[in-house]
């Protein structure tokens, strides 16, 4: 059967059978709706994939922490299991030892997903490339083509929106939890107290350095161990707007002082008579104000080196990172501008997006967005609308980041939306954060942080259960 001949009954077309597309197709079929799942492999392969299996894991076999009480990704695992996720079922069935993490046998995992989708009576798998916009007669489409979206489809999407619709290269600076920054060292101020669009004149957190600290920092950047480009990234050159911080440092010892770390227009209120030799600035990253990104600090340093080097910055000695920096090839949408809360393209609502293309990072995150996209697409087909889960849940917090929780920029300049892993910094703060332990003693330091995460997780699981009961007629996963 050719995929371009629509079945007699209503159907949703899902383009891309990675983790997000596979999960979307599964959720649509579970809701009793027919699905045509389009996968271009093996008709056309990519530089990253090695097989023609659905949901092939190309970079890692780890789904990261499975601790639902203390870790945001573990919490997302738990929510997805409650929602009957195929990806989580296949991961659990093909788990390999990895301590507290959920790691899987790659081949077994992909085979399980492929078998489940191939055997479902409402799912038709078509091996073909969709090399442009889907035909107009496809009125309900989920596009989940991932970071290696083919050029013809990417060009067609951009033609529907504008030149800034798609990015093809991540340039991600580290993002720090606001409450882990030492405010006895750092201070709020914009350069020259400038009030930019949406700003107050005190929009940046500033961390000062002496000359000795700056010199040691530059040396550490240059000496730090770097990540190599993957084979399919090597033909994507740096451009000056996203040079890695260590590449700038290699161009001359004073380069950073005349770039992102310039100390001009700022006065340290903790020591107003001493002018810092260099200053690291952090800018608010989300509307909640819980996350701050390190301005101009995109990097190819390995994660261990980033933690070691960036914690030498005054005020960041105890920094907790929501995500570390990176620079790699990726295709993703300017989702806060382009997508509605149901992940539909505002310029063409028949098209819904899912997975890494929307601006999430990680296997589990991509699959979870596919899960919601599938549920929403199925609801649309029967004339209903599905509100996203509350922002207090892991899935709702991630959707909120993608569709509106991120701020574009404080000062006029290029867009700043970047992909994000799930982390507790995306969640609304607790109304009454825990202050005492079960023994009645006041919580301090790490104990307070652990209690806060556990309270956020407990709230999330209660709220996802309530959302499922109110909006879905899905059995809970066993």
From Swiss-Prot:
Its EC number is 2.1.1.74. InterPro entries: FAD/NAD-bd_sf, MnmG-rel, MnmG-rel_CS, MnmG_N, TrmFO. It comes from the Bacteria. GO terms for cellular component: cytosol. Pfam families: GIDA. Keywords: Cytoplasm, FAD, Flavoprotein, Methyltransferase, NAD, NADP, Transferase, tRNA processing. Its main location: cytoplasm. Residues 429-448 are annotated as: Disordered. It is found in: Cytoplasm. It catalyses: uridine(54) in tRNA + (6R)-5,10-methylene-5,6,7,8-tetrahydrofolate + NADH + H(+) = 5-methyluridine(54) in tRNA + (6S)-5,6,7,8-tetrahydrofolate + NAD(+); uridine(54) in tRNA + (6R)-5,10-methylene-5,6,7,8-tetrahydrofolate + NADPH + H(+) = 5-methyluridine(54) in tRNA + (6S)-5,6,7,8-tetrahydrofolate + NADP(+). This is Methylenetetrahydrofolate--tRNA-(uracil-5-)-methyltransferase TrmFO. It comes from Rhodopseudomonas palustris (strain ATCC BAA-98 / CGA009). The gene is trmFO.
């Amino acid at each position: 059967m050719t995929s371009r001949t629509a079945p007699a009954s209503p159907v949703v077309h899902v383009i891309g059978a990675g983790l997000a597309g596979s999960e979307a197709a599964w959720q649509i079929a579970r809701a009793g709706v027919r699905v045509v799942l389009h996968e271009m492999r093996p008709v056309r392969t990519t530089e990253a994939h090695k097989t023609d299996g659905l949901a092939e894991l190309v970079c890692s076999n780890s789904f990261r922490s499975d601790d639902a009480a203390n870790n945001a990704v573990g919490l997302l695992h738990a929510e997805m299991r409650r929602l009957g996720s195929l990806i989580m079922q296949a991961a659990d069935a093909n788990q390999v030892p990895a301590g507290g993490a959920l790691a899987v046998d790659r081949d077994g995992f992909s085979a399980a997903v492929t078998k489940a989708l191939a055997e479902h009576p409402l799912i038709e798998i078509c091996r073909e490339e969709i090399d442009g916009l889907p035909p107009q007669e496809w009125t309900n489409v989920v596009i989940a083509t991932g970071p290696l979206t083919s050029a013809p489809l990417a060009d067609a999407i951009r033609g529907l929106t504008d030149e800034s619709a798609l990015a093809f290269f991540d340039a991600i600076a580290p993002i720090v939890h606001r409450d882990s920054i030492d405010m006895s060292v750092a201070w709020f101020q914009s350069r020259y107290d400038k009030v930019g669009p949406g700003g107050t004149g005190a929009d940046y957190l500033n961390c000062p350095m002496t000359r000795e600290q700056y010199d040691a920092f530059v040396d550490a950047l240059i000496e730090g161990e770097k990540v190599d480009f993957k084979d399919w990234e090597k033909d994507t050159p740096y451009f000056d707007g996203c040079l890695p911080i260590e590449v700038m440092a290699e161009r001359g010892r004073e380069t950073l002082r005349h770039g992102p770390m310039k100390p001009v227009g700022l006065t340290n209120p903790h020591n107003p008579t001493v002018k810092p030799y260099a200053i690291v600035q952090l800018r608010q990253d989300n509307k909640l104000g819980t996350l701050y990104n390190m301005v101009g600090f995109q990097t190819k340093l390995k994660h261990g080196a980033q933690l070691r080097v960036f914690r030498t910055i005054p005020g960041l000695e105890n920094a907790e990172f929501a995500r570390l920096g990176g620079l790699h090839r990726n295709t993703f949408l300017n989702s806060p501008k382009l997508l509605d809360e149901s992940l539909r393209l505002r310029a063409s609502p028949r098209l819904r997006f899912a997975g890494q293309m929307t601006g999430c990072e990680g296997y589990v995150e991509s699959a979870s967005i596919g899960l919601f996209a599938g549920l929403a697409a199925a609801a649309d087909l029967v004339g209903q609308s599905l509100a996203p889960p509350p922002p207090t849940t892991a899935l709702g917090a991630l959707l909120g980041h993608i569709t509106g929780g991120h701020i574009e920029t404080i000062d006029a300049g290029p867009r700043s939306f970047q992909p994000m892993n799930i982390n507790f910094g995306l969640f609304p703060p607790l109304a009454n954060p825990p202050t005492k332990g079960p023994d009645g003693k006041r919580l301090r330091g790490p104990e307070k942080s652990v209690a806060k995460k556990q309270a956020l997780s407990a709230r999330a699981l209660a709220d996802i259960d309530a959302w499922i009961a109110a909006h879905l007629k899905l059995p809970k996963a066993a």
